């Protein structure tokens, strides 16, 4: 999700945040960070000292992720045969809205500072939470690759098909994903993931040809 400002190195895409643009480049890097953090926590088990605000935020995200498991866990139930199946599935707006509400509440809470209170959390618990996050992110990456016809994309834009008027403006109810021409940045970042040699070799051949 692009919230504003410049989306990256490519100045021609500066208007994408205004088109409900999203960048898969950050998604691939998020998956890498989750993989690294999970590995590090497993190597050094024990307890973590987290600021109260972040500890609460982490647990809230975990609850949202768990409550939306039926929707975002579709990748586990069956494999997608074609991108039409993903488009028919629709957007998981409930998950998106809840995650964004939690993010905005966290930002507002820490904007002027933190309480200074710290909570002890076991690395085992954090690893479980992060593994669940990684599963959700991986599912999203798999969907994106199918939408890209086997070549992992870098950017998407979204068209609002349905909306309702609310007090502060308009609330989107339904989106249509729009594909953007391929950028090499997407496949390059994807190749850094722990997806196995077979998938990477297949991607290489598709990009090459």
Q: At which residue positions do the language-model features occur?
A:
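Acidic, mature catalytic/reactive cores of soluble proteins
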Residues: 1-209
């Amino acid at each position: 999700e692009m919230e504003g400002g410049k989306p990256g190195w490519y100045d021609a895409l500066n208007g994408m945040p205004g088109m409900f643009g999203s960048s898969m480049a950050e998604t691939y890097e998020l998956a890498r960070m989750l993989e690294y953090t999970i590995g590090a926590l497993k190597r050094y088990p024990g307890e973590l000292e987290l600021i109260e605000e972040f500890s609460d935020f982490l647990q809230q995200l975990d609850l949202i992720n768990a409550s939306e498991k039926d929707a975002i866990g579709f990748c586990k139930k069956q494999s997608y045969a074609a991108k039409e199946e993903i488009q028919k599935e629709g957007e998981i707006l409930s998950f998106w809205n809840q995650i964004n509400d939690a993010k905005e509440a966290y930002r507002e809470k820490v904007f002027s500072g933190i309480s200074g209170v710290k909570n002890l959390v076991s690395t085992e618990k954090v690893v479980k939470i992060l593994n669940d996050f990684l599963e959700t992110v991986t599912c999203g990456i798999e969907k994106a690759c199918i939408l890209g016809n086997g070549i992992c994309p870098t950017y998407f834009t979204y068209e609002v098909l349905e909306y309702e008027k609310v007090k502060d403006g308009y609330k989107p109810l339904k989106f249509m994903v729009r594909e953007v021409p391929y950028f090499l940045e997407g496949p390059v970042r994807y190749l850094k993931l722990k997806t196995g040699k077979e998938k990477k070799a297949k991607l290489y051949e598709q990009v090459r040809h």
